[in-house]
Structures are given as structure tokens and as C-alpha cells.
């Protein structure tokens, strides 16, 4: 059925649920797993005329976020490998999270995307996050959405 599964995770509690489901699915199908974490770029200023950060501070924050993301995908790879699933972790830095997910699915020739219904930015009362909605409406790859 599916041979290569892309797991899109942001480290949220709901994404961790998707991680477990993706690993279990890959294991049951004999599929490979690509664990992806997209790290959004950090703005120099959040509000016009308010707090600004130096480019050095922004780089430090982005590097720390990327390091956390790498540890997260490494943990997914380790968990998958322990179950005999071939897996690799990918960290991408981009403000275009959904487009990065779709691009990674194409690049790694994935035939299924697994992701949570919403992540860190989603309010609990929101049924479907904007990134998930974008992936569903703009991609050609089937998507398994977990909540």
C-alpha cells in the first residue's frame, strides 16, 4: 500500500500522537518513514516599534530551535528504528511550513503524509489548523490527519 510515509511534526502533544501512529503504520506496512520538523524563521521584530532583536540574537534563537527540532526528529528515528522501520529525520528552516511539508513529500517521494490536525499555534477549539488545511487543499499526496 504505502511505501514511504512523511511524518510532519512540530513537537506539540498532538504531533507526538501522530508520531506514534506514523511509526506504527510504517511498521505494519513495511514502509519507510521520513520524520520532518519545519522550524519557522524568527522575526527581528514582533510588533512595530516594540521589541527588536539583533541579527546575532535572531540567529542564536533560530539555531536553538533547529537543534531542538533535530533532537525531536532523532528521537522519532530512534523509536522507528527500534521497531525495525527504516527512518530518517529532516529539519527544514522556513516560514512556509505547509509548502515545506509538501516539498519534502515530493523530494523524498512519499506516498502518504501523516500530521496532526493542529499544532502549537492552533487553539484547542479550532478543528483544523491552517498548515494542515493548506497541506490538504494544495497537495496531491494523501494525508492522514490525527487529532
Where are these regions (language model features)?
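Structural beta-alpha unit
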Residues: 1, 75-113
Amino acid at each position: 500500500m504505502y511505501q514511504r510515509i512523511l511524518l510532519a511534526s512540530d513537537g506539540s502533544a498532538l504531533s507526538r500522537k501522530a508520531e506514534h501512529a506514523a511509526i506504527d503504520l510504517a511498521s505494519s506496512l513495511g514502509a519507510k518513514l521520513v520524520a520532518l520538523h519545519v522550524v519557522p524563521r524568527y522575526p527581528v521584530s514582533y510588533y512595530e516599534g516594540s521589541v527588536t532583536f539583533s541579527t546575532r540574537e535572531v540567529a542564536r534563537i533560530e539555531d536553538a530551535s533547529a537543534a531542538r527540532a533535530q533532537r525531536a526528529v532523532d528521537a522519532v528515528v530512534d523509536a522507528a528504528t527500534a521497531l525495525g522501520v527504516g527512518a530518517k529525520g529532516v529539519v527544514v528552516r522556513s516560514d512556509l511550513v505547509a509548502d515545506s511539508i509538501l516539498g519534502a513529500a515530493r523530494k523524498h517521494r512519499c506516498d502518504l503524509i501523516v500530521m496532526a490536525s493542529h499544532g502549537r499555534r492552533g487553539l484547542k477549539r479550532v478543528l483544523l489548523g491552517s498548515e494542515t488545511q493548506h497541506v490538504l487543499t494544495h497537495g496531491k499526496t494523501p494525508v492522514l490527519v490525527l487529532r
